[in-house]
Amino acid sequence: MVTIKDIAKLANVSHTTVSRALNNSPYIKEHTKKKILELAEQLNYTPNVNAKSLAMQKSHTIGLFFTSITNGTSHSFFADTIKGVNQAISEDYNLYVRGIDDLKNYDSVTPMRYDGIILMSQSDIDNSFIYHIREKNIPLVVLNRDIDDRTITNILSNDKEGSQEAVEYFIQSGHQDIAIIEGIEGFKSSQQRKEGYLSALIQHHIPIKHEYSVKGQYDMESGFQAMERLLALPNPPTAVFCSNDDMAIGAMNAIFAKGLRVPDDISVIGFDDIGFSQYITPRLSTVKRPVEKISVLGAQKLLSLISEPETKAEKILENTEFMVRDSVRRLTT
């Protein structure tokens, strides 16, 4: 492996001069810099990131933490988040991904290990993790969950508005008996989506039936089980809003298992717009949440914060988009 000392020997300069030239120092004459850069290219020189990190007191690592990777995080949500962050971080950074619930303690989360952290937060149980990061003065951006600390850059989607729009679509299609399969209890996304559901019913003077609210776990199995409970009611709903697409797919399978059809017998709307949602039969109407866009923006904001620590914190709310497909039946003509 070619080192700085090898280049220095061939260029007949000190290794300090080579190091400065490779880092585009203004203190190195242009002709010397050009000679060194040409030699580095000819020799296929690759910087030793670990050595550079020690010298600059930087880890060149970005931490991407989820509340949990195994509980309540769908494959598509996980993939879109990583894809978005990877689009934004430069080749100078490594990405380390972990679930907070996998950590025994926070001792390993230090400025020496992470230049900055992106937290894809799903619950206020993350607050102790946020406090730790702040205490260690590690640059931080929080995604997905609305937080009260206005000194932290916070980026999320308007889930309440998105779910309200979905339920209003049911109402405009003539549905009155509308149920909800909720997400994981304690998750902010679950709360926001239920609030949107309730707001739509209240604004349109539709009675709220508590038996139409069934809890799920953001997975297909819980969606299936929740739908079975709704179908067992004396007066089953004609429409069901599911707090994510995985549960919507599970709910549709429960409907099919009873010999019923979507949307002829029961209409279904999901949330997230996972890639699979437009390839099932019928194609699932759903609320598209801009997870990848939020992740790209979060990584960009973190890089700005790393380079300019005095960057002002901001709260950014991204809009959702309702995707009309084939899973809702119109009862009114």
Curated annotation (Swiss-Prot):
Determine if Repressor is one of this entry's keywords: yes
Location of the HTH lacI-type domain:
2-56
Keywords, sorted A to Z: DNA-binding, Repressor, Transcription, Transcription regulation
GO annotation (BP), single: regulation of DNA-templated transcription
Q: Name one GO molecular function term.
A: transcription cis-regulatory region binding
* Positions of the DNA-binding region: 4-23
The induction comment states: Induced by galacturonate, repressed by glucose.
Effect of disrupting the coding gene: Cells lacking this gene express the exu locus genes (required for hexuronate utilization) constitutively. Its absence additionally confers the ability to grow on minimal medium plus glucuronate, which cells cannot do in the presence of ExuR.
Q: Is Disulfide bond given among the entry's keywords?
A: no
Superkingdom in the source lineage: Bacteria
InterPro entries hit by this protein: HTH_LacI (IPR000843), LacI/GalR-like_sensor (IPR046335), Lambda_DNA-bd_dom_sf (IPR010982), Peripla_BP_I (IPR028082)
Q: Spell out the Gene3D superfamilies in the cross-references.
A: 3.40.50.2300, lambda repressor-like DNA-binding domains (1.10.260.40)
Q: What does this protein's UniProt record list under function?
A: Transcriptional repressor for the exu locus which is required for galacturonate utilization.
Name of protein = Probable HTH-type transcriptional repressor ExuR
